[in-house]
């Protein structure tokens, strides 16, 4: 070993005469600084009502919010991992100001603010609007299925519950007949006219118990056997009443759905895209709907139904409640194209670039329309009749109403040909046994489809269709692949919504940081975080001063 070799001085236990700032080692352009400036500028006065004046002083909600959001930005969703990082990571130590809440405190804070965190998300989006990152004029809609925390074998099917409930009611009727034979005639229950509910069964079992208690003591062997039989029927009736109450509770929890999970009744069993066994197995989950703009999440909602068609109206209906108005333009795929949704957009004054189910098929280069399809037949609007390929007139015979799963009633006109027997094109026209072909046409839906086709094939429509592929799909890709948010970690819809709201806020802040660090044409950073933070804080300070002046003027 060389004698003149010198190492740098190393003393991990050395003490400093003057304490240094902990953020001296945090870069000025780090996302943690923009997160801190954004949260400090938000109005968290709504959190004050969630705390009590008495007792030990709680941790400041701004500190807790910053720590949780920074964890979500870095793919850390476990409260126990956050607790460890508060001891080890300099970024977390700086955000918390050397405070170290444990995992239970962090989890309690999330549950405490679950009704207020949605307002914070709205404030953040409005700040993005003020800064020009989003406009809320257009919404790119799409949905994805997120698996619930519940186990995949905790399923409860509606048909099974209804079938077992009918079998149980039949057992109860037979048991009540046996009880009537054992009880006095004046206390016997009329099984045929009696409404079998858990409450009535409880009353019957109570009367039966009183009758057993007032009976004389059994002495002989036959009397004791009869007494044991009565006690057995009494216990069996109680078990049937409890089981009937359980079945009724399951049906109430379903709320029109076909399945629920035992441990997470808000979740519905759906077929997920991630199917490892490739057998189409259903898993408990939620249908997550988002609206994005410039790859920022502007709105979201969770639904129990797996199809996107029924989520369109309630999802867009929540937009005015959050921002006070509808978006002027909506872009969505063919999963949302239905008469009910088109009519809603027409009445709300929304320009809808929404595809219908046959849009892609009709616009393929090699597409050849079916000559015998009702859409290809000639329609005389004045006479309200169709002409078949053989030139025969198809007159209108009536109107048929159909009800969708959401309760919407659509009307279809029926048209029937007069002479189809002996037609040389009959084998190509239709396959029914009847000698007269009948077609159903929804004129209102066809009008909406023509309007949607004109919008989608216009120059603006082609542009919007191209942007839709990189808007919500990019958000889902970042969420599932890069941020590892593929499954919910809570049970119950209220907690699941709370968890995703935290994620949506963290996602938007992370996207904001990414946009601020974009490289310009010369290869240099367009602006540093320091300049943006100063401008942002000054803007929010002036906004607070204006609000104070306005409150004094109106007081």
Locate each region found by the language model.
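Secretory-pathway/luminal and periplasmic proteins that interact with or process carbohydrate-rich
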Residues: 92-97
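Anion-binding and metal-coordination hotspots
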Residues: 3, 8-9, 68, 75-88, ...
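Short alpha-helix boundary/capping elements
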Residues: 42-43, 72-75, 90
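Hydrophobic alpha-helical membrane-insertion signals
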Residues: 1-33
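Basic, short loop/linker segments at the boundary and entry of helix-turn-helix/winged-helix-like folds
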Residues: 27-69
């Amino acid at each position: 070993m060389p004698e003149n070799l010198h190492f740098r001085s190393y003393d991990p236990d050395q003490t400093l005469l003057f304490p240094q700032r902990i953020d001296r080692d945090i870069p000025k352009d780090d996302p943690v600084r923009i997160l801190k400036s954004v949260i400090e500028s938000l109005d968290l006065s709504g959190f004050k009502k969630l705390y009590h004046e008495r007792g030990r002083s709680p941790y400041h909600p701004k500190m807790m919010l910053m720590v949780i959001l920074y964890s979500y930005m870095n793919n850390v969703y476990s409260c126990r991992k956050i607790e460890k990082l508060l001891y080890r990571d300099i970024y977390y130590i700086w955000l918390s100001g050397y405070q170290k809440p444990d995992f239970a405190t962090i989890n309690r804070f999330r549950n405490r603010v679950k009704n207020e965190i949605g307002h914070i998300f709205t404030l953040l989006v409005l700040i993005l609007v003020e800064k020009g990152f989003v406009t809320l004029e257009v919404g790119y809609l799409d949905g994805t299925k997120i698996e619930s925390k519940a186990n995949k074998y905790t399923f409860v099917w509606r048909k099974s519950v209804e079938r077992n409930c009918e079998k149980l009611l039949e057992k109860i009727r037979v048991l009540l007949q046996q009880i009537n034979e054992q009880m006095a005639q004046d206390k016997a229950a009329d099984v045929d006219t009696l409404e079998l509910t858990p409450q009535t069964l409880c009353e019957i079992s109570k009367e039966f118990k009183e009758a057993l208690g007032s009976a004389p003591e059994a002495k002989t062997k036959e009397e004791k056997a009869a007494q044991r039989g009565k006690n057995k029927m009494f216990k069996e009736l109680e078990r049937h009443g409890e089981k009937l109450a359980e079945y009724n509770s399951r049906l109430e929890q379903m709320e029109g759905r076909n399945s629920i999970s035992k441990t997470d009744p808000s979740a519905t069993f759906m077929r997920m895209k991630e199917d490892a066994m490739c057998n189409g197995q259903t898993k408990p989950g939620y249908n997550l709907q988002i609206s994005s703009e410039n790859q920022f999440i502007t709105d979201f909602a969770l639904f129990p139904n797996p199809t996107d068609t029924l989520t369109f109206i309630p999802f867009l209906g929540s937009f005015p409640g959050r921002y006070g108005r509808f978006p002027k333009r909506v872009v969505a795929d063919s999963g949302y194209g239905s008469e009910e949704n088109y009519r809603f957009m027409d009445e709300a004054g929304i320009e809808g670039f929404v595809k219908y189910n046959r849009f892609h098929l009709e616009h393929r280069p090699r597409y050849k329309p079916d000559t015998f399809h009702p859409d290809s037949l000639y329609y005389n609007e004045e006479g309200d009749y169709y002409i078949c390929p053989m030139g025969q007139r198809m007159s209108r015979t009536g109107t048929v109403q159909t009800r969708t799963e959401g309760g919407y009633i659509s009307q279809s006109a029926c048209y029937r040909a007069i002479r189809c027997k002996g037609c040389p094109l009959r084998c190509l026209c239709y396959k029914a046994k009847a000698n007269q072909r009948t077609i159903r046409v929804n004129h209102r839906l066809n009008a909406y489809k023509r309007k949607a086709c004109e919008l989608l094939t216009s120059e603006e429509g082609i542009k919007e269709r191209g942007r839709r592929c990189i808007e919500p799909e990019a958000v889902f890709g970042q969420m599932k692949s890069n941020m590892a948010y593929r499954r919910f970690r809570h049970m119950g819809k209220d907690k699941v919504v709370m968890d995703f709201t935290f994620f949506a806020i963290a996602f938007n802040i992370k996207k904001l940081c990414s946009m601020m660090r974009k490289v310009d044409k010369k290869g240099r950073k367009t602006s540093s975080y320091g300049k943006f933070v100063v401008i942002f804080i000054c803007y929010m300070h002036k906004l607070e001063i204006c609000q104070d002046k306005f409150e004094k003027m109106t007081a």
